[in-house]
């Protein structure tokens, strides 16, 4: 994960235009007095009545700019056009051999039109980054193979890279040129003044566009086990836009694999809008905080697989940095959590932890610092995870996890964590 200098200031000020008052007034959540909450302070459980308030409809009720929010979003399955796409990418014999080439050409031709652009990617390995700029038309990148493994976008990018090394890795063949639609994204990273590029520039696929879709392909940050178990953020996919759909995809990495983010065109964390992301029928792999960010995200029938091969001393799946006035962060339902053989002994992975973004110097400030929200419901969790204490201390501040088990609890009480379970099946 990453710290934003300006984002930290904004977080401290909490210039969020009253998210609860604006968007969620009817959803002030309080425990049901007729049902005693289950669980412990280290593993709190929701009652059926409480869990019923966390639905995809409510996570996706509104999004976009808080000053003029968009209405409800009800994602339907991604459908492909019946006619062959005009934009086709293949390792050879196609109009484009690089995905970024097709993205640039499609945007240049269509401009800001609202008609969706479908880019067909033939089976093969594409070693490149793919950047989708803010304001692009709706774009669907889809793999033409029978399985998502047949189309793979990959590159090894480490948050610890110097700017010079980033330039060499990402743009050695002038994949990004001034005047290209995504040039500004590359330039934001290629001319940083910091010693390293940081998490924000370590993504293989990075979309700042609304209505972005990925279907039937794999994205890998192939840094993987080439580095030690220390801090080496390597993002496979980062999204900043609203109404993002990921369907039948495989996202592979180690630390920080999937970043469901909310940033502006200048690559700064913002608190004045909400991004919504829907992940369906997919696979995500990593070791530390490998699904993280501020978006309202729903994961439906997703397989989360935690690996130990990098020998990291800690392992966490989810790390949301939900704004304190937003009742909704991550909803995981009908999903599966597994781990490899490294977690079959006394060393266990955690389901997640809050990300107290921006509070490294101040410590957690109740009502001001981000307070990550998660509900994992109706899912299967294998023996790789810590059943008694599945949630870790917060990232950035090391704030100890504290679950609310009061019979009269409010589920958004800022004095407590907001990481919950409901009706999960833990394998012995």
Where are these predicted regions, by residue range?
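Short, Lys/Arg-enriched N-terminal segments with co-localized hydrophobic residues
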Residues: 1-10
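Bacterial N-terminal signal peptides that target proteins for export
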Residues: 10-18
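Bacterial N-terminal signal peptides
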Residues: 19-27
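C-terminal motif of bacterial Sec signal peptides marking the signal peptidase cleavage site
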Residues: 29-31
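Sequence-level preference for short, compositionally simple segments enriched
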Residues: 38-92, 96-428
